[in-house]
Amino acid sequence: MTLQQQIIKALGAKPQINAEEEIRRSVDFLKSYLQTYPFIKSLVLGISGGQDSTLAGKLCQMAINELRQETRNESLQFIAVRLPYGVQADEQDCQDAIAFIQPDRVLTVNIKGAVLASEQALREAGIELSDFVRGNEKARERMKAQYSIAGMTSGVVVGTDHAAEAITGFFTKYGDGGTDINPLYRLNKRQGKQLLTALGCPEHLYKKAPTADLEDDRPSLPDEVALGVTYDNIDDYLEGKNLPEQVARTIENWYLKTEHKRRPPINVFDDFWKK
C-alpha cells in the first residue's frame, strides 16, 4: 500500500460522494450521539463565517431540529458562538452564515481582552510571544470559551475538522483541533462545498478563500499560501489522483510532520514518532 493509499484509508476519504447521503450521515451521527448520552443538551460551535463552520453549524441545527421534533425534548439546543478578536474584517460573512444556519441561540464572546491579558501575564514572566504563537493563543482562547459555554449548558463542543484539513494538520493543537465531535471528518474541501450547495447556502460563504486569520503580521493569510499547495491539490490527492511529484511530496510532508496532532498525547507505547 502506498503512502497515499494509507493516508486516504486513515482519513476515511472517498473519491466521490452523494451530497444528500453525506448530509444525512452527518445529521444522523449527531442525533445518535445525543440519544446515546441523554444528559447532553446542547451542541456548541464557533461560527467564523467560513465554509467549514457554516456547514457544521447547519448540520448541527438540522440534527437538533429533528431530534426535538422526534423526542419532544425542548431542552435540546444548538448554540452558535461568535468569537471575534476585536473587530472581525469579514463580520458580514459571519452574520450571513448565522442567517443561513438559523441557530437556536447566538452568543458573542470577544476574545481580545483574554488574549491580551494572557500575553501580558507571560510578558511579566519574561516570555514575549511571537506573532505566530499569539495566533495559537487566539485559537485556544476560542476553544476555552466554547468549553465554558458547553460546561454551563450540558453541551459538547463541535469541531470542523475534515480530511483536507486533517491531512496537513492545519489546525491549532488544543485549539480548534480540541473538540468533542467532528461531523465533517471524512470529507474533503470540494465535497464540503457540494453539501453546502445541496443545502442552499449562499455561494460567497464557500467560494471565499479559506483563511485561519490568526496572525496579526499577516492578516487574512490564505490557507493555500501558508500550506504551499492548493485545496484542489489536496482534494485530488485524497481522491487518489496522480499529482506532480513535488506537490504530492509537500502534502505528504505535512501529513508526516503533523502526525502528533492527530493522536492523543504520546505515551511510552507509541512508536510512530520513531519512524
Swiss-Prot record:
Q: What is the lineage of its organism?
A: Bacteria, Pseudomonadati, Pseudomonadota, Gammaproteobacteria, Enterobacterales
- Sorted alphabetically, which PANTHER family does this protein's record hold? NH 3 /GLUTAMINE-DEPENDENT NAD + SYNTHETASE, NH(3)-DEPENDENT NAD(+) SYNTHETASE
**Sorted UniProt keywords:** ATP-binding, Ligase, Magnesium, Metal-binding, NAD, Nucleotide-binding
Q: What class of enzyme is it?
A: ligase
What positions does the entry give for deamido-NAD(+) binding? 140, 173, 180, 260-261
Annotated source species: Shigella flexneri
Q: How does it assemble?
A: Homodimer.
Protein function: Catalyzes the ATP-dependent amidation of deamido-NAD to form NAD. Uses ammonia as a nitrogen source.
Which family does this protein fall into? Belongs to the NAD synthetase family.
Q: Which InterPro entries match?
A: NAD/GMP_synthase, NAD_synthase, NH(3)-dep_NAD(+)_synth, Rossmann-like_a/b/a_fold
Q: Which GO terms describe its molecular function?
A: ATP binding; glutaminase activity; metal ion binding; NAD+ synthase (glutamine-hydrolyzing) activity; NAD+ synthase activity
The terms describing its cellular component in GO are:
cytoplasm
Pathway given for this chain reads: Cofactor biosynthesis; NAD(+) biosynthesis; NAD(+) from deamido-NAD(+) (ammonia route): step 1/1
- UniProt-annotated binding residues for ATP: 46-53, 160, 189, 211
Describe the reaction catalysed, as an equation.
Answer: deamido-NAD(+) + NH4(+) + ATP = AMP + diphosphate + NAD(+) + H(+)
Task: Give the source's domain of life in one word.
Answer: Bacteria
- Identify the Pfam families for this entry: NAD_synthase
Q: What is its EC number?
A: 6.3.1.5
Q: What is this protein called?
A: NH(3)-dependent NAD(+) synthetase
One record GO biological process: NAD biosynthetic process
Instruction: Tell me which residues bind Mg(2+).
Output: 52, 165
